[in-house]
Amino acid sequence: MLPTLKKSGRPRDARGRFIRHHERLPVSLADTRGALFVASEMADFIKAGGLGDVAAALPRALRHRYDVRVLIPGYRAVLERAGKVEIVGRVLAHAALPACDIGRIVQSDGLPIYILLSKELFERDGSPYVSTSGSEFEDNAIRFATLSHAAAQIAAGHAGLGWKPRLLHLNDWPCALAAGYVRWSGGTTPCLLTIHNLAYQGLVPYSMAAALGIPAERVAELEFYGQMSFLRGGIVNADHVNTVSVSYAKQITGPAQGCGLDRLLAGRAAKGALTGIVNGIDASWDPRTDEYLDSHFSVNQWQGRQANAAQVRKAFGLRESTGPLFAVVSRLVHQKGLDLICEVAPQIVAAGGQIAVIGGGEPEIERQVAELTRRYPGQVGAFIGFEEGLARRMFAGADFLLMPSRFEPCGLSQMYAQRFGCLPIAHATGGLIDTVDDGVTGFLFQHASVEALRRCLERAFRTFRLPSLLSAMRRAAMLRPSGWDVAGKKYLSLYEHTAATAPALATVS
């Protein structure tokens, strides 16, 4: 049984940890402007990726200027943590999309959350998107079209809530079709679509168009190489599209990272309707107070890092060492460049370094990592899986974070590492370009190749042997602004821009 969210006290995330947002400003809704933030996951209740963290943090960062409310599906984990849910509205059936009640809870910090209730669609085991066996739910198209349609109905004032948003903020493919449902019904509510990862597009066969309630004359808006793409439909119909970093917004307009949508996105960019905003990270990532650390430290007091490094070495079965400790906190998949790490591991060990790996993913890469631990006992250690406290201690104790991702829309690990004084060694792509200042707050290499990574590692080893330079870089990394207050201000401006430049504003009640 998963824990129930308490009615009082600070809100907790899906793992039961306190959500702490030191940058959250006092809530004043005298100048109220409504925004509905629609997401398929939220770390308060359930999380499958970085979107869950954003959905928990960004609405809270905006509430001093907007009446932001969140809409999420009523997964089993959500209902178990939500406590008592008040039924406040209902959306009607549409084509094959079932009617659903809308529940409402208010988090202890005052954030209102609407929950789309459907036992048939959402109350099941597994993650938001896949079953316990790891396969996608066969009815995902119906599930998330229902979420999208509900958002459009709320925007139109047809859900009985007594409230209409001035703007819809949609996130990734599961919510993208809401922009289409708004437009296809003649609605004018401004829609902002945030793309967290363009690689996931919500592809479904054309044969489902009628079941999803897509007008026959608008099906072409979703066309993607013989299928329909929820994400493409959102990009076409949203008033503005943004991504989670400035560099990623530029990269997806080209064929290398455009995932087949580059021409469409380039067209939106040419009209000023595609921008990028780097994500923030939660205030709980603070080495002075982190609840998972036994030894705290700060930019002016480093001793705690040594104690954390010793804990990490012990946890991973590594020998005591005065050499650099390299951390890998990642899904073990090709996209994250884990094959490159496996190739350079012998060089790291030969130069006196050690490697600690935490994560899970593709069986072949897991096998390669396991082989490295057998080949270099005491120098390479791995934990296949994930454990939050251990990951945080790795950031707090390691000298360098290996992050050679082939593409990275934003990335959070590099910012977590920087906050804890662990210097990222990263491929210059997407959000890594925007968050790692080469030679100042970490190290970047330009090509996702073994040779480029090797040369970057040589720079890192040279820096490690210069204590004054290493300390200066750690300090710069720890002091880099990365909280949600920075991103929140940019989203507030984007909300205003989207509302002001939409062809016609909805009548706000």
From Swiss-Prot:
Q: Name its GO BP terms in alphabetical order.
A: glycogen biosynthetic process
- Gene Ontology terms for molecular function: alpha-1,4-glucan glucosyltransferase (ADP-glucose donor) activity; alpha-1,4-glucan glucosyltransferase (UDP-glucose donor) activity
**Binding positions (ADP-alpha-D-glucose):** K47
Q: Which reaction does it catalyse?
A: [(1->4)-alpha-D-glucosyl](n) + ADP-alpha-D-glucose = [(1->4)-alpha-D-glucosyl](n+1) + ADP + H(+)
- List keywords of the entry alphabetically: Glycogen biosynthesis, Glycosyltransferase, Transferase
Class of this enzyme: transferase
Q: Does the keyword Glycosyltransferase apply?
A: yes
Is this entry keyworded Signal? no
| E.C. number(s) listed in UniProt | 2.4.1.21
Which family does this protein fall into? Belongs to the glycosyltransferase 1 family. Bacterial/plant glycogen synthase subfamily.
The record describes the protein's role as: Synthesizes alpha-1,4-glucan chains using ADP-glucose.
What HAMAP family does this protein's entry cite? Glycogen_synth
PANTHER family recorded for this chain?
GLYCOGEN SYNTHASE, GRANULE-BOUND STARCH SYNTHASE 1, CHLOROPLASTIC/AMYLOPLASTIC
Protein name per its UniProtKB record:
Glycogen synthase
Q: Which organism is it from?
A: Xanthomonas euvesicatoria pv. vesicatoria (strain 85-10) (Xanthomonas campestris pv. vesicatoria)
Write the gene name.
glgA
